[in-house]
């Protein structure tokens, strides 16, 4: 993670065109220019010039950012806005002890998830010889859910799966601005994969995939499981007919593979919801001070799901799965796409 001062040129290259306003979910709700990247960059310019201080008020606006990356995708100047906001958060984090205390508690909770649960973990099919070998990065979700789904699908793709017990990829620390904890998570990952003779990593979570790729480790290949399914042209057939919709996580980098699966799985009737690729609002759900305003984002997603009249909502990000489940109110079930396929396809 770079220091904020290293982004000086990018911050000054913002043309104030306002395209970010048209795609920012937070601006759509608040209509406050300080809550969108254009307004934030004006404040960050003042911060770098010494005209402003890193105050709680400025941090509040930084905190409003969902880190969905919609502004980055539409920015004509190609500015990586999410990384700049994260660096600004890191600057605030360094000078505020309470932020460090909260992150310390968070790290204890996250790194404490590395406990295997009986019955959730399995091994490769011992009677089969595989053409390929990959390492499965489960992260927080893999440690809680197990690896059965991943192994069964990848074994069907003629791929052997190595399953070390990884810790969190570090993305919660990154968005919070806890640079030290993020670097610690990265180093723990590097130390673990160095024990194995393969440099190909597979994950089922879009946020984990994007974070691991951001490590920029030489020779490391990071893919999501859906790439392998499509590469092998794996025939997928559900045991019974199921109608489902899909929420596209903001961090997903290759939706084409998932789209292929949704449209080529026999007995799966895929109903695309309105704004299926719009942020679920995960980063704002627990910000109680702005709850009345920010709860509109997940509520809109819930309403879009309800309009499809389905009982099954699929996604491919642990955070999105948690956020969508929180607002489901028992009206539908939210499932990880990998687990859904492993549970419902015919063998």
Predicted regions and their residues:
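Cysteine-centered iron-sulfur cluster-binding motifs in ferredoxin-type domains/subunits
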Residues: 9-27, 59-79, 249-251, 277-278
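Short glycine-enriched loops at secondary-structure junctions
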Residues: 29-30, 206-207, 228
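Phosphate-coordination loops involved in phosphoryl transfer and adenosine-cofactor binding
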Residues: 131, 240-241, 310
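Conserved hydrophobic helix-helix packing surfaces used for dimerization/oligomerization
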Residues: 134-136, 243-244, 313
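Cofactor-cradling patches in redox/metallo enzymes
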Residues: 78, 139-224, 253-347
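C-terminal amphipathic alpha-helical segment
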Residues: 225, 231-265
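N-terminal cysteine/histidine-rich coordination modules
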Residues: 1-60
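Iron-sulfur-cluster electron-transfer modules
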Residues: 41-216
């Amino acid at each position: 993670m770079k220091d904020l001062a290293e982004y000086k040129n990018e911050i000054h290259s913002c043309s104030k065109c306002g395209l970010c306003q048209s795609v920012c979910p937070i601006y759509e709700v608040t209509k406050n220019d300080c809550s969108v990247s254009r307004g934030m960059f004006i404040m960050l310019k003042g911060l770098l010039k010494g005209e402003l201080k890193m105050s709680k008020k400025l941090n509040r606006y930084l905190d409003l950012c969902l880190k969905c990356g919609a502004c980055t995708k539409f920015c004509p100047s190609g500015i990586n806005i999410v990384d700049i906001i994260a660096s600004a958060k890191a600057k605030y984090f360094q000078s505020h002890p309470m932020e460090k205390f909260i992150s310390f508690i968070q790290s204890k909770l996250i790194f404490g998830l590395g406990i295997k649960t009986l019955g959730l973990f399995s091994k490769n099919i011992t009677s089969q010889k595989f053409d390929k070998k990959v390492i499965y990065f489960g992260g927080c979700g893999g440690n809680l859910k197990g690896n059965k789904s991943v192994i069964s699908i990848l074994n069907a793709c003629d791929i052997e799966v190595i399953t070390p017990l990884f810790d969190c990829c570090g993305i919660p620390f990154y968005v919070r601005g806890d640079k030290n904890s993020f670097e610690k998570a990265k180093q723990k990952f590097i130390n673990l994969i160095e024990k194995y003779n393969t440099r190909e990593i597979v994950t089922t979570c879009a946020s984990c995939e994007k974070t691991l790729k951001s490590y920029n480790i030489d020779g490391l290949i990071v893919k999501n499981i859906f790439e392998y399914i499509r590469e092998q042209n794996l025939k997928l057939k559900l045991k019974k007919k199921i109608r489902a919709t899909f929420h596209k996580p903001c961090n997903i980098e290759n939706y084409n593979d998932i789209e292929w699966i949704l449209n080529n799985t026999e007995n799966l009737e895929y109903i695309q919801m309105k704004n299926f690729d719009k942020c679920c609002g995960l980063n704002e759900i627990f910000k109680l001070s702005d709850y009345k305003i920010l709860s509109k984002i997940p509520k809109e997603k819930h309403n879009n799901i309800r309009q499809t009249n389905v009982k099954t909502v699929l996604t491919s990000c642990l955070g999105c799965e948690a956020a969508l489940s929180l607002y489901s109110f028992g009206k539908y079930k939210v499932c990880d796409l990998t687990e859904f396929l492993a549970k419902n396809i015919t063998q």
